[in-house]
Amino acid sequence: MRIQSLLLLGVLLAVGSQLPAAFGRKKGEKSGRCPPDDGPCLLSVPDQCMEDSQCPFTRKCCYRACFRQCVPRISVKLGSCPEDQLQCLSPMNHLCHKDADCSGKKRCCPSACGRDCRDPARG
């Protein structure tokens, strides 16, 4: 009985260590995505983290203003943003900053003139 318990524990530990990779994440990487980095570059600021495991709670280690720091993660909707073939003549303000700013299944996507809410690409 004791050998079976140890064997079962070993199998569970082995499978559990592979779960992040099975879900497309590296070991220690937290769920969610980094918010867009729209800030100006602050070159003299040192990185505050190198990976998600160095950040408290649900925060993620993300590039913000050209250095890494722990920031609140954002959730991402299914689907990918469509490609934008246009060129912008006069940049406009962002109409969204994250997927949660968009209604329904729409995603906050980068475009030639800024971010806006769009239906995800098909295929």
Curated annotation (Swiss-Prot):
Highest taxon listed in the record's lineage? Eukaryota
Where is it mostly found? Answer: secreted
Provide the protein's localization.
Answer: Secreted
Q: Which GO terms describe its biological process?
A: antibacterial humoral response; innate immune response
Swiss-Prot/TrEMBL keywords? Disulfide bond, Protease inhibitor, Repeat, Secreted, Serine protease inhibitor, Signal
Signal peptide start-end: 1-24
Query: Could you name the Gene Ontology cellular component terms for this entry?
Result: extracellular space
Describe the location of the WAP domain by residue ranges: 27-73, 74-121
Name the cystine pairs. 34-62, 41-66, 49-61, 55-70, 81-109, 88-113, 96-108, 102-117
Instruction: State one molecular function term (GO).
Output: serine-type endopeptidase inhibitor activity
Q: Which organism is it from?
A: Callithrix jacchus (White-tufted-ear marmoset)
Which Pfam families does the record cross-reference, listed alphabetically?
Answer: WAP
- Which InterPro entries does this chain map to? Elafin-like_sf (IPR036645), WAP_dom (IPR008197), WAP_four-disulfide_core (IPR050514)
Q: What is this protein called?
A: WAP four-disulfide core domain protein 5
- The protein's role, per its UniProt record: Putative acid-stable proteinase inhibitor.
